[in-house]
From Swiss-Prot:
Disulfide bond annotation, renumbered to this chain: none
UniProt name for this protein: Alcohol dehydrogenase
Family: Belongs to the short-chain dehydrogenases/reductases (SDR) family.
Signal sequence residues: none
Species the sequence originates in: Drosophila subobscura (Fruit fly)
Amino acid sequence: MSLTNKNVVFVAGLGGIGLDTSRELVKRDLKNLVILDRIDNAAAIAELKAINPKVTVTFYPYDVTVPVAETTKLLKTIFAQIKTIDVLINGAGILDDHQIERTIAVNYSGLVNTTTAILDFWDKRKGGPGGIICNIGSVTGFNAIYQVPVYSGSKAAVVNFTSSLAKLAPITGVTAYTVNPGITKTTLVHKFNSWLDVEPRVAEKLLEHPTQTSQQCAENFVKAIELNKNGAIWKLDLGTLESITWTKHWDSGI
């Protein structure tokens, strides 16, 4: 899929991987890049505009933990402004297993709520045009970092939720896939808390292993968006992009 003249809404598009991905996106000659994030970063927005002045870059403050009704209200404003949204990227995330409720709220519940809100506009059963959802998971959604089970569990939930969305595409007209970064050099992993402090040096130990840069991750992130494969579970690790096969151990039969 060509991203030329597409309208993309990026939740948390100013974070570590998020900002580098936004930089790559504007190079693709989008029509609009709408960034939703908790904290405004005027310098980053200005930089994105300067990279490609042909792309309209706008920012709206957004906390993914707000009720669905609040998200729907914000999306209504965005649709009124740019008329159509082609791709929604759900990228909000925190890594701190001391914050159990917030980890689940940001990493999973917020993603579900944002998705639910945009379906109000996209669902073909309501006369919507359909759309594409790219959800950011993590390789910990496949195999947990067991010292951070809350974070890992939230990412496993993202993978399962998104796989379900993909199977619902014939009904809703909305396709979906996950991008799942491996350990990436960002502020997220430089210092974080393990669950019940089971490993005080978890961040330090993790970074002893091979990592990738956020730029490497961002380049493959955008490649995955361009490949636009419904139901794909993309692994973005050590500078590579790979579609993995989820092992089926049970089938509901429906």
